[in-house]
Amino acid sequence: MVTGELKSKIDNLWELFWTGGLTNPLDVIEQMTYLMFIRDLDDADNVRAKEAAMLGLPHKSIFAGEIQIGDRKIDGSQLKWSTFHDFPAAKMYSTMQEWVFPFIKNLHGDKESAYSKYMGDAIFKVPTPLMLDKIVTTMDAIYEQMEQIKSADTRGDVYEYLLSKLATAGVNG
């Protein structure tokens, strides 16, 4: 169930995109989806690490060691939402644009997979560092609110609400 408070935070996030110049509702939902995926990758990796530690099993993080993007390398931990969300706006933006987004586009490495075909055309469209900083902060607040609700279907409800905004945006121009 999407509460009034959660709807308000989602509306604020939507407004950040619109006032920042990203006015196509499909682009807004697409960018939100990419950013949610990036955050979820970090969260899922952290859960797997904790579970492995509890069971005394090894865990190889997808963010472990150096990650190569093109002909450059970066410490994989820099690509984690939980790391870069604390960066100053300019550094967060360059990290997202130059490292995180290319990383998720090539996550599976198999150029023929359905994932690679879908992500092959993905473009990071957030236009400014300050806008990204505000979006990341707002998304952190949304995730915090979603954790408090503790419903198994909250994510689906949030996405349904986003899609309803898409329908409304189409009607309102």
List each language-model region with its residue ranges.
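Non-catalytic, mostly N-terminal accessory regions of nucleic-acid modification and defense proteins
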Residues: M1-G173
